[in-house]
């Protein structure tokens, strides 16, 4: 019997080896369905795996958004829920009304377009309209661009649209920064994602700003949102807007094609109509695809720069922690330093540091409770690091004995002698 136990224990202690490949003879004896299952696993195409991964990402994002929406909805009071429903219905009605109005406006402009084309007053009024819709939360920027092309043609309409856009976005940036200054400071100190995005503009700010301006984002809202980034200056934002003005040729071109179709509808052949309609559809498709592509690239670049900034901050924290020195400022620019400090706090939590100069964790035991351990882990009660050497002013715990019975912590059990 002992021999059997020994052999069994030895067999159980052996590591589990992976399944060996079967010989051709053994492979023939396998069931047919086993061959089919293995062949399906081995022949899974990369496109199927990629589509499955993309589908999983979409499902995960939708699940997270739904969970976040439910969580926010539960926090709302009864009247807040009624207000949220009313605001959603109002937004839908305004959107539908705006779409209907946009479709009708070109029919109204048809009879007067030729007259307004020669009027500088109409030019100035339309320029002011484009200028003022740059301020959040006004809408209609794209519509006014199409109207500019409809009335003045592609090139003159583009000049009107581009100049009003550059000046309007710059003024909107300055006004929004002045009004939202307190909001900016609060976001910089509390929101690590906001601080990370602000720091990414420190590296290739102009390039990233141009990419943001090319993204299909709400125009006036984008002006107000970018103004909250303290690392972006008004002149830089105006320059980035000026560099992407060739994008504004798209709505101006669409407006000019719509006017040609409306004025020469009866004179044009079916082929000419098809060419103009296809050119409009193609231009819209190119604009949508370009905006989507640049939006994806912008997000990827922002994540890359954020990872780089976090890595630099992490190395700096670890170096100062190893040298037992407090960490200084990250930058001479106060706005950049505030954003970096916010990220540094987040990196401290990830690394496990409690403070810039906190090198040890002390366990505080409450003598009054006798057996309870205080959860407070602080360096203020034990400012000095641990050491084994004693000076004349320190007491030796082994020389003093166990002390009074009220301060003894018994970690053993008493065994009664039988």
Curated annotation (Swiss-Prot):
* Bias-annotated ranges (Polar residues): 1-10
Provide the alphabetized UniProt keywords.
Golgi apparatus, Membrane, Transmembrane, Transmembrane helix
Q: Which residues lie on this side of the membrane: Lumenal?
A: 1-81, 141-157, 256-273
Report the transmembrane regions from the record. 82-102, 120-140, 158-180, 235-255, 274-294
| GO annotation, biological process | mitotic spindle elongation; vesicle-mediated transport
Region (VTT domain), start-end ranges: 149-258
Family as reported in the entry's similarity comment = Belongs to the TVP38/TMEM64 family.
Query: Pfam family of this protein, just one?
Result: VTT_dom
What is the top-level taxon of the source organism? Answer: Eukaryota
Note whether Membrane occurs among the keywords: yes
The record's region (Disordered) falls at 1-26, 367-388
Q: What is this protein called?
A: Golgi apparatus membrane protein tvp38
**Principal location:** Golgi
What is this protein for, i.e. what is its function?
Answer: Golgi membrane protein involved in vesicular trafficking and spindle migration.
- What species is this protein from? Aspergillus fumigatus (strain CBS 144.89 / FGSC A1163 / CEA10)
Q: Cytoplasmic side: which ranges?
A: 103-119, 181-234, 295-418
State its location(s).
Answer: Golgi apparatus membrane
- Write out the domain note: The VTT domain was previously called the SNARE-assoc domain. As there is no evidence that this domain associates with SNARE proteins, it was renamed as VMP1, TMEM41, and TVP38 (VTT) domain.
Q: Give the way it sits in the membrane.
A: Multi-pass membrane protein
Gene name? tvp38
Q: Which GO terms describe its cellular component?
A: Golgi membrane
């Amino acid at each position: 019997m002992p021999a059997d136990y020994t052999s069994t224990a030895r067999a159980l202690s052996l590591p589990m080896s992976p399944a060996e490949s079967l010989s051709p003879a053994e492979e023939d004896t396998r069931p047919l369905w086993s061959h089919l299952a293995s062949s399906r696993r081995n022949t899974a195409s990369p496109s199927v795996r990629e589509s499955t991964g993309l589908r999983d990402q979409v499902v995960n994002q939708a699940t997270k958004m739904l969970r976040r929406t439910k969580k926010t909805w539960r926090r709302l009071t009864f009247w807040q829920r009624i207000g949220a429903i009313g605001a959603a219905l109002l937004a839908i009605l305004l959107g539908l009304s705006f779409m209907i109005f946009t479709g009708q406006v070109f029919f109204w402009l048809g009879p007067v377009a030729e007259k307004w084309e020669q009027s500088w007053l109409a030019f100035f009024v339309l320029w002011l309209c484009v200028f003022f819709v740059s301020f959040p939360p006004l809408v209609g920027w794209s519509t006014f661009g199409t109207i500019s092309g409809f009335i003045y043609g592609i090139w003159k309409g583009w000049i009107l649209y581009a100049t009003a856009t550059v000046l309007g976005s710059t003024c909107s940036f300055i006004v929004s920064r002045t009004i939202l200054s307190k909001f900016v400071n609060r976001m910089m100190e509390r929101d690590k994602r906001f601080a990370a995005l602000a720091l990414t503009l420190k590296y290739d700010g102009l390039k990233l700003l141009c990419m943001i301006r090319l993204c299909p984002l709400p125009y006036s809202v984008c002006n107000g949102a970018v103004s909250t980034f303290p690392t972006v200056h008004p002149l830089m934002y105006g320059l980035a807007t000026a560099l992407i003005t060739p994008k504004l040729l798209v709505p101006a071109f669409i407006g000019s094609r719509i006017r040609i179709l409306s004025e020469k509808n009866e004179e044009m052949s079916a082929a000419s109509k098809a060419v103009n309609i296809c050119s409009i559809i193609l231009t819209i498709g190119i604009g949508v695809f370009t905006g989507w592509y640049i939006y994806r690239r912008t997000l990827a670049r922002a994540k890359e720069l954020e990872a780089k900034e976090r890595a630099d901050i992490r190395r700096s924290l670890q170096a100062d922690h190893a040298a037992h020195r407090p960490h200084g400022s990250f930058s001479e620019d106060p706005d950049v330093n505030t954003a970096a400090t916010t990220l540094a706090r987040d990196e401290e939590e990830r690394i496990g540091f409690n403070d810039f100069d906190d090198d040890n964790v002390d366990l505080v035991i409450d003598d009054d409770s006798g057996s309870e351990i205080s959860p407070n882990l602080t360096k203020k009660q034990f400012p000095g690091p641990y050491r084994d050497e004693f000076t004349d002013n320190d007491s030796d715990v082994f020389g003093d004995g166990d002390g009074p019975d009220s301060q003894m912590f018994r970690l053993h059990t008493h065994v009664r002698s039988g």
